[in-house]
A protein has these predicted regions:
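Active-site cofactor/cluster-binding pocket
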Residues: 1-197
């Protein structure tokens, strides 16, 4: 999984929370954050591998199966689809747009859309979308159970009121994500697709 976000949105923390939930559910994980001296708002990425076998590879993920994008404007700056595996990629995107308003490359076969910024402003009063997008990821992929994901929040990062707010954020992200499955057929990279809702 490759997480894309901006500094301050919590992409690295999102990967850490998901990693903990995956371990609880019996998976092996390997996480690699990727950030330098970027300021708040600059593009950042985090990488998370999981498997039912020990993972030895510790590099960045250049050919992701899944992409989680925490920011609806990031695609203007970063090619979030770079390296996505052909005809099996999954995109979980923070956006208020509908599927018909987005340009999705043909190598993506499933898309989860969540208006995470609106939810974040409602829950937190600012656009921190990481836990909301974890809920969206679970809705789109069933990678872990929703209960497991919310149960590890207190162990990884949050306490008291912040814990309650982030549990609500995950649940709302899960509930308000719209999942689209795109029919699998061989397409060239130049072709466009019409999604089925």
């Amino acid at each position: 999984i490759r997480f894309h976000g901006r500094g301050g949105q919590g992409a690295v923390l999102a990967a850490k929370i998901l990693a903990k939930a995956l371990v609880v559910e019996g998976e092996y994980i390997k996480g690699v954050p990727s950030f330098g001296f970027e300021r708040r708002g600059a593009p950042v990425a985090a990488f998370l591998r999981f498997d039912d076998h020990v993972i030895r590879q510790t590099t960045n993920i250049y050919r992701p199966d899944w992409i989680v994008c925490l920011d609806p404007t990031l695609f203007k700056t970063v090619d979030i689809f770079e390296g996505v595996k052909e005809h099996r990629g999954i995109l979980v995107q923070a956006t208020a747009k509908s599927m018909n308003e987005l340009t999705i490359p043909p190598r993506i076969v499933k898309v989860g859309l969540c208006d995470a910024v609106r939810i974040a402003l409602d829950v937190f009063g600012r656009s921190i979308t990481n836990t909301i997008m974890l809920g969206a990821l679970v809705r789109t992929t069933d990678v872990v159970s929703l209960d497991c994901l919310t149960s590890v929040l207190g162990e990884v990062a949050f306490r008291d009121a912040a814990l309650d707010a982030n549990v609500e954020a995950i649940r709302r992200g899960y509930q308000q994500t719209v999942v689209h499955t795109i029919p699998r057929r061989m397409l060239s990279d130049e072709e466009t697709i019409t999604p089925h809702v």
